[in-house]
Amino acid sequence: MSQRITIDPVTRIEGHLRIDCEIENGVVSKAWASGTMWRGMEEIVKNRDPRDAWMIVQRICGVCTTTHALSSVRAAESALNIDVPVNAQYIRNIILAAHTTHDHIVHFYQLSALDWVDITSALQADPTKASEMLKGVSTWHLNSPEEFTKVQNKIKDLVASGQLGIFANGYWGHPAMKLPPEVNLIAVAHYLQALECQRDANRVVALLGGKTPHIQNLAVGGVANPINLDGLGVLNLERLMYIKSFIDKLSDFVEQVYKVDTAVIAAFYPEWLTRGKGAVNYLSVPEFPTDSKNGSFLFPGGYIENADLSSYRPITSHSDEYLIKGIQESAKHSWYKDEAPQAPWEGTTIPAYDGWSDDGKYSWVKSPTFYGKTVEVGPLANMLVKLAAGRESTQNKLNEIVAIYQKLTGNTLEVAQLHSTLGRIIGRTVHCCELQDILQNQYSALITNIGKGDHTTFVKPNIPATGEFKGVGFLEAPRGMLSHWMVIKDGIISNYQAVVPSTWNSGPRNFNDDVGPYEQSLVGTPVADPNKPLEVVRTIHSFDPCMACAVHVVDADGNEVVSVKVL
């Protein structure tokens, strides 16, 4: 007998997401992912100066602000054929790497970890045993018995108060929770320590960007960071050294805590290396430009079809015609007019809500495709593309996680197992580890270039008063490939579309009725208790949904409390 469960809204994500599943014999047989809010930001920037768009569209989201700002600036620079000073590229790259580091740490600890960690079980842990478990795999200075005892006492105080505070409403004691008490205690301690690490990442962003969220230093043509090593109120030597101190602290936490915790979770939940396979077509764009024309990058891009790394097709630049021509969005199952597939430059965002229907329209998210195929974007796609491209650093970072996994389990971990729920989490960790090298590299590049006497950070753009110009700004954001598509006509924006990572991944069935990546990833997932569908939430959280970005103002009648309906 089949059952229907509805989770509305899914929590510990950004925005509002509803998931519906049909369950037969304890396993998900069908799924629907529904974005339940409408954004409409594209309509707001029409008829405005293209230099203003980045400041507005970063308000699409309070989490992904920096990525939208930079993607929008790149779109305008693409349309106007502007060469960006390399100092501006270095500064932008440092901001993006620090922002993404922050985002990945937030996802693992604050948004995803509580799907795997039983907070109450940590009360039974032996702090000394917990500390001993980490010897040989981590040198983190806060892995001492004394530190773990302090954390355990905090949990005891919360339980004694009758309120678990930030740890309330978890599925504690769920049969799918498998970590021993000591590992649960370690995870809670690192959850709390991660909060301070996130502050360090944001300090890097704020020192260069003016503030965060919603940075202030970008400009079409570069950045608004005047450089004078001896000056005041500018990017000087003191501020640069301050930034470097936070970069060094970030690297220590990522390498000694985040990387190790990822391997530990995988070691105790190996079955989740076989669950959660999504679209198996993967798309990622090159990132971290090192020249003024966005033609040379530190990270490669590419496309992989049907989980076959040998099918890898390189994408070498943001102006790659193969990339640009392959992207379309349709709205057959979304609450918009113009259902047929459209290129983003021609796309519209006109709402047409007519109720929720299994076989009809059921989401505010559109359905992007790449040459007609559903694809997954994000850290898993990014990792697989870089592995297929032969990037040595990516393989080395993955090998380090696999080595810890092997030490704990005695088993190896194959690439084929990465097409999974835990594969996405591992991909995100590999990406974050590589970002620490990017931060060091781009900081050194900036210092070296300044030392050569180049202090240029901005070139004034020329916006023709007549004529039409099209541009697209691609960016590999924390959740995957982001693109902003801008049409400038007679000096102002005539059309604007954002095709964001969570649109690619959370999109409903497309024009050909193919299911979206979220929906595909849930099929085959076992659910032990339909009233507590932890297994469903684990896989959805592995994508790190950001629905404020994905949808095209929140319903005033929306629930703030999670509702799980079993029919």
UniProtKB/Swiss-Prot annotation:
The keyword Hydrolase does not apply. It comes from the Bacteria. It is found in: Cell membrane. Keywords: Cell membrane, Membrane, Metal-binding, Nickel, Oxidoreductase. Residues 553-567 form a propeptide. Ni(2+) binds at C61, C64, C546, C549. Disulfide bonds: none annotated. Its main location: membrane. It is a peripheral membrane protein. It catalyses: H2 + A = AH2. Its EC number is 1.12.99.6. The record marks H552, V553 as: Cleavage. GO terms for molecular function: ferredoxin hydrogenase activity; hydrogenase (acceptor) activity; nickel cation binding. Its cofactor is Ni(2+). GO terms for cellular component: plasma membrane. InterPro entries: Ni-dep_hyd_lsu, Ni-dep_hyd_lsu_Ni_BS, NiFe-Hase_large, NiFe/NiFeSe_hydrgnase_LSU. Binds 1 nickel ion per subunit. NCBIfam families: PRK10467.1. This is one of three E.coli hydrogenases synthesized in response to different physiological conditions. HYD2 is involved in hydrogen uptake. Heterodimer of a large and a small subunit. Belongs to the [NiFe]/[NiFeSe] hydrogenase large subunit family. This is Hydrogenase-2 large chain. The gene is hybC.
